[in-house]
Amino acid sequence: MSSMVTPQHAQELSTGARELGIDLSPAQHEQLLAYLALLIKWNKAYNLTAVRNPDEMVSRHLLDSLSVVPFIEGTRWIDVGSGGGMPGIPMAILFPERKVALLDSNGKKTRFQTQVKLELKLDNLEVIHSRAESYQPEVPFDGIISRAFSSLEDFTGWTRHMGDVNTRWLAMKGLHPDDELVALPSDFHLDSAHALTVPGCQGQRHLLILRRTA
């Protein structure tokens, strides 16, 4: 384990995952901590996340990402505006049988993501350096997820072409974004909304699941 990742971090991850109802294998636990170590190391130079304190990263990044695990269905996912790789990298670690793509227009961030893919040997992870509106997938994704990426209007507008009526759009938010829902494009609707409790995180967390009507 990296010297930057402490036994307290390891314990917080184990306990938090259990509270979320997630049974991490020893290998997954180790991979998540290896990812955390890379995030701490690269964040100093690359500004991957505004969270500077490593002691806050387990709850605000790892456990926050794991909180959406019960809602992941289907085999092909894309994390849009992935930044430091949340929630896509934890998803790829948890679901080795699913394909997860990370999309970001920032070259520093995609370089970091590629390094994580190589070091953690995540064969199911694809890193895409592109703007959302420019990226053209060959087939629609089963799920499109974003974490604090943009407004719901922009998120759906920029990624509409990546999915179809069978796709689920998952938007990870803080407060329930009532004002953003009003501005949702007419061909999208709210399928369900879920208040999430993230161990160690203060403040509200919500997951909104959206679908296309046509």
UniProtKB/Swiss-Prot annotation:
One matching Pfam family is: GidB
Q: What does the entry list under GO cellular component?
A: cytosol
Q: Where does S-adenosyl-L-methionine bind?
A: 81, 86, 132-133, 147
Provide the catalytic activity annotation.
guanosine(527) in 16S rRNA + S-adenosyl-L-methionine = N(7)-methylguanosine(527) in 16S rRNA + S-adenosyl-L-homocysteine
* KW Ribosomal protein (keyword) present: no
Q: Where in the cell is it found?
A: Cytoplasm
Matches recorded under InterPro entries: rRNA_ssu_MeTfrase_G, SAM-dependent_MTases_sf
HAMAP family, per the entry? 16SrRNA_methyltr_G (MF_00074)
Which family does this protein fall into? Belongs to the methyltransferase superfamily. RNA methyltransferase RsmG family.
> What's the stated role of this polypeptide?
Specifically methylates the N7 position of guanine in position 527 of 16S rRNA.
| Official protein name in the record | Ribosomal RNA small subunit methyltransferase G
